[in-house]
């Protein structure tokens, strides 16, 4: 059928104040009389956004490939993202666990009203790095909305990440008694709320986001008696290098199995045809 561009979308933020811009990918053979699960690809910033560059790109990650498996895929730049006004960028300063999630949910609900083929009862999310932080946070803070999440290499506790990130967007660490201002933003403090299916992934040699960020969440999930899935990639840094296609396939399989309710092909190999 050839290449097709994603649909440009505009929705309102959580308060109905600002226009939010994004992209939507649909299956090439979309049947508007059917219902499709929706997957939100997220990168919350605050130094960037989910959509990424506004320049033309023939492909944006594997979003179209994921859509072809039977999903609606969206990327929405929420409040707190750059390239807008100062007040827009500062929208959740010092509240890093916000992660634009109320904007994402508001936008997804508006899209479901606009496009009746979207099934909000089957909503998923995935992201890498800051998007991994946001995805786990979504599964813990909004467990009745997001049913499936894939959290890759997330900076789940910004006390264990670069100070030039945390202090820039959350402020200096301050302590009141036994609690500090970063504590309630850390995903391990919210892990007990998990209801859906969550996959955590991390490279064991990540020198950007140390793997102990994910171990903190794993420890909290175990203590809370929660079921989850874990993929640790030996010798991989913040990106997964030679294991990137493997992780992409695991991501596809996880959504197909748990959000679409289908059985993915066993050990499918992604790569050039021989």
Question: Where do the language-model regions lie?
Answer:
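Serine-hydrolase catalytic core recognition
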Residues: 1-274
């Amino acid at each position: 059928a050839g290449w097709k561009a994603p649909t440009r979308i505009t929705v309102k933020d959580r308060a109905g104040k600002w226009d939010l811009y994004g992209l939507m990918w649909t299956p090439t053979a979309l049947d508007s009389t059917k219902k499709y699960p929706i997957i939100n690809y997220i990168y919350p910033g605050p130094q960037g956004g989910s959509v990424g560059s506004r320049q033309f790109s023939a492909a944006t990650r594997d979003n179209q490939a994921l859509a072809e498996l039977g999903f609606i895929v969206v990327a929405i730049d929420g409040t707190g993202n750059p390239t807008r006004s100062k007040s827009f960028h500062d929208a959740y300063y010092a509240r890093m666990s916000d992660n634009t999630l109320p904007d994402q949910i508001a936008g997804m609900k508006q899209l479901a009203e606009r496009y009746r083929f979207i099934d909000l009862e089957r909503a998923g999310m995935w992201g890498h790095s800051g998007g991994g932080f946001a995805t786990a946070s979504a599964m813990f803070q909004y467990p009745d909305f997001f049913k499936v999440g894939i959290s890759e290499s997330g900076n789940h506790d910004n006390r264990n990440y670069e100070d030039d990130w945390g202090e820039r967007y959350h402020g200096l660490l301050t302590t009141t008694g036994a609690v500090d201002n970063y504590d309630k933003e850390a995903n391990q403090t919210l892990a007990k709320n998990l209801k859906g299916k969550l996959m955590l992934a991390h490279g064991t040699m990540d020198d950007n986001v140390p793997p102990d960020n994910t171990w903190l969440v794993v420890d909290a999930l175990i203590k809370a008696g929660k079921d989850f899935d874990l993929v640790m990639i030996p010798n991989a840094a913040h990106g997964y290098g030679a294991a990137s296609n493997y992780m992409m396939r695991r991501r596809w399989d996880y959504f197909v199995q748990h959000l679409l309710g289908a059985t993915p092909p066993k050990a499918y190999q992604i790569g050039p045809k021989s």
